[in-house]
């Protein structure tokens, strides 16, 4: 195993993420003032995705710390699913989702984040190094190589290991977020919402932004009934290193080591095969995880 200057890598990622998030937040499209009830489905999510990818890559390569790290010059991921030739043993590769939740951004300029993972080339395979996620409100999550989760802000360099439990939900109802904003997913999530009952408040967005809310806000659980790409589950990999519970929709709880081996060390960019991460549930504790898993099983059995 080749060593990585992890602290330097995380510092470079923090600065690069700050520049990317600020670019999106300060863009002309983001600054336009809309009626809160008005949806803007004509605004292309691809525009912000592609621009953010270019900004991330440009700032990563321009960072003075990058010269001290052996990083592949091409950032790959959702907006550039092409692995460059000539990657050497020991080099670092960034897999990026530049604006995860771009459909939320398109509709309301909220509910998105910039996220991804970093892997290292090792012979014919890859080794997971870190995962990262940054939200427009400045929240920044980074995973240190020793498994400690660093939570801080993109606006300053202060980062602290996350050691306590995820914050409790102060409201009467539990809150669950599910990947159901697309029509194709609604038939999978609607029966689950029904099975959870009136004690649960259901939100129809998921992915990295929702898992970030699980760790720092009042969201109790997140589930995605669909397979996803590894850059879509960066925050899930981070959550597994905290007191949160992450597992399959069948009730199998995944350890951080399992996630690293099964998902974090695999590089698959072909759009036809890159969604190899199975459906998942993340929750603040095991009781909530089991409750959502039971609702998923009941919902699937209902045949709705």
Segments the model singles out, each with a brief description of its role:
Residues 1-99, 293-304:
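N-terminal subdomain of lithium-sensitive/metallo-dependent phosphomonoesterases centered on the IMPase/IPPase/PAP
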Residues 17, 145-147, 162-304:
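An extended, acidic
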Residues 43-51, 106-108, 205, 229-233:
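Short, conserved micro-motifs enriched in small and acidic residues
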Residues 70-75, 83-89, 121-125, 135-139, ...:
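Exposed regions on extracellular, virion, or secretory-pathway luminal proteins
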Residues 72, 125-130, 198-199:
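A broad structural signal for short, well-ordered beta-strand segments within beta-sheet-rich domains
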Residues 78-80, 97-99, 135-137, 179-180, ...:
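Fold-independent oxyanion-binding glycine-rich loops
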Residues 87-150:
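DPxDG-like acidic metal-binding loop motif
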Residues 148-149, 155-159:
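Short, surface-exposed beta-strand-loop junctions and turns on beta-sheet-rich folds
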């Amino acid at each position: 195993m080749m060593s990585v200057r992890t602290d330097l890598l995380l510092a470079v990622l923090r600065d690069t993420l700050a520049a990317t998030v600020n670019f999106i937040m300060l863009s002309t499209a983001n600054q336009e003032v809309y009626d809160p009830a008005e949806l803007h489905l004509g605004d292309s999510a691809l525009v912000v995705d592609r621009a953010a990818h270019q900004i991330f890559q440009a700032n990563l390569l321009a960072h003075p710390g990058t010269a001290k790290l052996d990083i592949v010059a091409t950032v790959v991921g959702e907006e550039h699913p092409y692995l460059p030739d000539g990657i050497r043993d020991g080099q670092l590769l960034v897999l990026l989702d530049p604006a995860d939740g771009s459909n939320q951004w398109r509709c309301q300029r909220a509910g998105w984040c910039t996220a991804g993972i970093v892997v290292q080339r090792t012979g014919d395979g890859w080794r997971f190094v870190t995962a990262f996620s940054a939200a427009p409100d400045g929240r920044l999550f980074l995973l240190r190589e020793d498994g400690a989760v660093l939570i801080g802000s993109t606006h300053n360099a202060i980062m602290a290991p996350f050691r306590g439990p995820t914050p409790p939900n102060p409201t009467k109802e539990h809150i669950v977020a599910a990947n159901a904003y697309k029509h194709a997913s609604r038939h999978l999530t609607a029966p689950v919402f029904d099975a959870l009952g009136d004690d649960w408040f259901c939100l129809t967005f998921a992915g990295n932004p929702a898992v970030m809310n699980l760790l720092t806000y009042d969201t109790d659980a997140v589930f995605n009934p669909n397979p996803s790409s590894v850059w879509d589950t960066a925050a899930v990999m981070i959550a597994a290193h905290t007191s949160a519970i992450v597992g399959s929709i069948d009730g199998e709880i995944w350890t951080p080591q399992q996630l690293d081996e099964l998902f974090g060390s695999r590089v698959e960019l072909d759009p036809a095969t890159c969604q190899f991460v199975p459906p998942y549930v993340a929750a603040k504790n095991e009781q909530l995880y089991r409750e959502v898993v039971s609702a998923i099983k009941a919902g699937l059995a209902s045949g709705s």
